[in-house]
Amino acid sequence: LQGAVTCFYNDQWEGYGDAPAFTQAIEEHFSTIYQKKTDQIDIHIGSASIESASNRLLIALQSLAEKYQTKVNIHVSEGISAVESCKRSRQTTPIRLLAQLGVLNENWNLIHAVNIDQEEIEWIAKADAKVIHCPVSNAKTGVGIAPILALEAANVTIGLGSDACSNNNTNNIL
């Protein structure tokens, strides 16, 4: 049995700009946490969502994932409101933003990915990024159903997740 723990870092909320000094301190903190990695527990890096991460932070997370040979976990396109928020502040969707920044690749675990279109599915597949499906949380919050069949048809790897306690009464994925 194996699992992963994610250290989430956030440096903004949509539209308020980033905090470069905070971004610079992330590696020092993550390197300390990463030392706790074992054969059974991997340590991932991430941000709670596109809304809580500046472009600078998204690029920094990718750099750290490469350096530490780990994954980046991030909530994307969970609900239509998250997609619309990203469009308002960044003039694009979350998946397109990651692609435009040049960070969308095999290191990225895209949590939820409910409100994505066929072109985004193709980009996810081409990048070999993964989607983490959280059906219980998605049902509780009413954000919709991820396009699992379309993702599967595109050969995207789909994992099963529980989301967080704030969006789910349990972290039991079964």
Segments (PLM) and residue ranges:
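Metal-coordinating catalytic core of metallo-dependent amide/deamination hydrolases
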Residues: 1-114
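Active-site-adjacent C-terminal substructures of enzyme catalytic domains
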Residues: 103-174
